[in-house]
Amino acid sequence: MLNFKHLMAAALLLSTSLGVQAERLKDIASISGVRSNQLIGYGLVVGLNGTGDQTTQTPFTLQTFNNMLSQFGIKVPAGSGNVQLKNVAAVSVSADLPAFAKPGQQVDITVSSIGNSKSLRGGTLLLTPLKGIDGNVYAIAQGNLVVGGFDAEGRDGSKITVNVPSAGRIPGGASVERAVPSGFNQGNSLTLNLNRSDFTTAKRIVDKINDMLGPGVAQAIDGGSIRVTAPLDPSQRVDYLSILENLEIDPGQAVAKVIINSRTGTIVIGQNVKVSPAAVTHGSLTVTITEDPIVSQPGPLSNGQTAVVPRSRVNAQQEAKPMFKFGPGTTLDEIVRAVNQVGAAPGDLMAILEALKQAGALQADLIVI
């Protein structure tokens, strides 16, 4: 059994010597089983200013509306299937149920149009049950939407749209009705899961905890998980974890990576990226094609016809680029300076990095997203 008073005293002593590059344990790891749960529901938004679903094209909206009316004892006459409800929209409602959320607490919800509603601005979400993956209702949502975008259309068909008016949020729009069972207070141990698996970081966490509490209190399961002995008393367990999660850990250096987004031209080069000795030159070839048609005018009394004769001019120009050389163990700063000296655009830099990787000179993972 852990000596909890000894733990408090040791933690107080360790808190006076924190590393400069250290990070809190709570920022790099989470407790197994302590997580949020996703909820989803289907409902109706009413009160729209003529921007709701076109019910002839979205029959499920009218069906949902009729089902709601029947719950209030209102029967819709037969043959009214072509009724237009321009101020009603069918929506999906989603929310994250935080860990340890209790009945009566409020959570934020996101409301998104399912049909062809133009805008949910000014709408009110009617009572909507939110279910978990197990089919149970964990929260009830209702309230007025906050929509950041808007949509406007003129009589001539001109239209302007700002942001996304077909989705919105309701802060505190759902009331928790059922708590999710948690295994936090069960057993004599807890498992810490690293946000990024790293054997060096896992070992440093184990060493830090064992130095403070004694050998064998923390054990590494693998590069991403650590098992820690914990008090059986729930109140002591909370105090115990409040100390552990504030421990300062010096995490291991991340794997060297170069991330390339080919769609946006964004390139991110990690700090640990290095280049082996290599020489690089990257030319820029520009091909210009211009059309300069001429008019052929026949001579008088020749019975000829005036005609347009195409005339194309093709010009190819290649810009000379100086060669730059990477020495052994070239760092990120040196890579950036060398690339800037030749004036390489993002597209050129992508080609250079890919060529370096193929040549075996780029000591990093090249990831294209």
UniProtKB/Swiss-Prot annotation:
Protein name per Swiss-Prot or TrEMBL? Flagellar P-ring protein
Q: Does the keyword Mitochondrion apply?
A: no
One of the protein's GO biological processes: bacterial-type flagellum-dependent cell motility
- State what this protein does: Assembles around the rod to form the L-ring and probably protects the motor/basal body from shearing forces during rotation.
> Where does the UniProt annotation locate this protein?
Periplasm; Bacterial flagellum basal body
Q: Name one GO molecular function term.
A: structural molecule activity
Renumbered to this chain, the signal peptide range is: 1-22
Question: Primary place of residence?
Answer: periplasm
Q: Which gene encodes it?
A: flgI
Q: Which GO terms describe its cellular component?
A: bacterial-type flagellum basal body, distal rod, P ring; outer membrane-bounded periplasmic space
Recite the UniProt keywords alphabetically. Bacterial flagellum, Periplasm, Signal
Question: Which family does this protein fall into?
Answer: Belongs to the FlgI family.
Q: Quaternary arrangement and interactors, per the entry?
A: The basal body constitutes a major portion of the flagellar organelle and consists of four rings (L,P,S, and M) mounted on a central rod.
From which domain of life does this come? Bacteria
